[in-house]
Amino acid sequence: MEDTVIDEYAHFATQIARDAGAILRDRFGQPHEVHYKGTIDMVTEADQAAEALIVSRLRDAYGSHLLLCEEGSRGTVEESPYRWVVDPLDGTTNFAHGMPTFAVSIALEEAGQPIIGVVYDPMRDELFVSQRGGGATLNGEKLRVSATDRLISSILVTGFSYDFGRRARQADTWRDFLTRVQAIRQTGSAALNLCYIAAGRLDGYWERGISPWDVAAGALMVLEAGGAVTDMGGGPYHSDDREILASNGTLHGDLLHVIAAHEDASVANAELGS
């Protein structure tokens, strides 16, 4: 694909991400109608309004492309090399509880490979953009992963499954890392976790039970900023996997070593995350 075409897609995605983000920002802190997709997995009318805007714009502009969206919208075209992967509100739990850490995430894949990723944090007005072979930026400034080369100096981030039994198993890995690193964070937004690695704010991220819309845009961000993204066994990463390990690259082997002592491939089919 020509660079000019990728530029066009990226520009379009940034515009709709900003517009969807404005919906979230305007509704943040207001009373919400909350529905539960599971015991603790929620969706608000803000998710639905932001997704409706994104889906409408994408269908009008690129009606032949496939769509994969968190809140249920799907494309009708069975065969297309292009797929938009959208999370209109990554961090719904934060949003619903009045915590200002959430984002709009939009990715475009060609033949299963990401070619653009856009993540917009409307509360901080931070726009992360990546293009295949073109690097990653934050508000127009080039991003580069951290140079951290020791676990004890690193800050990691993770997330936990909505399944309580699975959380107990995940906690074993968390406890092991906790004795080896400077700190572990949990932001509640997979998309921002990955963008923060790309920006050098965090050094590594692992999680099982995630969905394509959680990580498709952010994974490209990490790669284009010089980092590494694999599955949790060190194999090739695909957005339809339900697991991810991302890092600044330098620490990737150390992270894999710790995870291997705790993670069993049999739990790779964890339920979809937020």
Where are these regions (language model features)?
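An extended, acidic
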Residues: 144-274
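Acidic active-site catalytic centers that drive phospho-/nucleotidyl reactions
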Residues: 41, 47, 51, 70-71, ...
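N-terminal subdomain of lithium-sensitive/metallo-dependent phosphomonoesterases centered on the IMPase/IPPase/PAP
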Residues: 1-89, 250, 264-274
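Short secondary-structure boundary/capping segments
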Residues: 34, 59, 74-77, 119, ...
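Small-residue (primarily alanine) positions within well-ordered alpha-helices
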Residues: 13, 17-20, 50, 117, ...
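Residue-level signal for inorganic ion chemistry
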Residues: 24, 47, 58, 92, ...
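DPxDG-like acidic metal-binding loop motif
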Residues: 78-137, 152
